[in-house]
């Protein structure tokens, strides 16, 4: 029938992604192989909201520590994005984190990634020039550049 269609929708518990900025104004980026695009990708730290987890902020704090080893003293909420509106329910909550303290990574057994530091402006320009392919990273860097954050933790 005209106007009717069948849709396949991917159900997703949601995710978080963090623009973590050092005192030297460098942003933490992780470099890892992504099977879906068959390539090594440079992106901001991120991760899924675990089943039963209801607070994206707590998930963001956990994921930053697990992936990079860092903890943050100040956190700003940047906003949320729906990266695949045509076929997925996924929402990614974006945060900016500053006043970082280094620690030890706590990666999942199947995770292998390198943590790198890039000057924020260099990372932003890489995203603006199309040199990064990860949508959440591009969006979060653009949002942080415009300082659209609201401080959540003193």
PLM features: what roles do these ranges have?
Residues 1-17, 22-23:
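Acidic, metal-coordinating catalytic segment for phosphate/diphosphate chemistry
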Residues 4-5, 41-42, 103-106:
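Short small-residue beta-strand/loop micro-motif enriched in glycine and branched aliphatics
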Residues 8-9, 31, 136:
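Short linear motifs in exposed loops
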Residues 14-17, 48-135:
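Unchanged
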Residues 15-44:
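A glycine-rich, hydrophobic loop/mini-helix early in the fold
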Residues 126-154:
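Long hydrophobic alpha-helical segments typical of transmembrane helices together
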């Amino acid at each position: 029938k005209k106007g009717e269609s069948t849709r396949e929708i991917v159900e997703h518990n949601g995710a978080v992604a963090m623009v973590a900025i050092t005192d030297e104004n460098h942003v933490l980026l992780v470099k890892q192989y992504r099977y879906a695009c068959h390539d090594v990708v440079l992106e901001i730290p991120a991760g899924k909201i675990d089943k039963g987890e209801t607070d994206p902020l707590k998930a963001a704090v956990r994921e930053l520590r697990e992936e990079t080893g860092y903890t943050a003293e100040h956190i700003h909420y940047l906003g949320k994005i729906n990266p695949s509106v045509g076929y997925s329910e996924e929402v990614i909550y974006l945060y900016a984190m500053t006043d970082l303290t280094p620690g030890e990574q706590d990666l999942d057994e199947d995770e292998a990634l390198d943590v790198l530091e890039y000057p924020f402006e260099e990372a932003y320009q890489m995203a603006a020039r199309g040199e990064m392919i990860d949508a959440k990273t591009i969006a979060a860097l653009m949002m942080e550049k415009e300082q659209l954050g609201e401080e959540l933790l003193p």
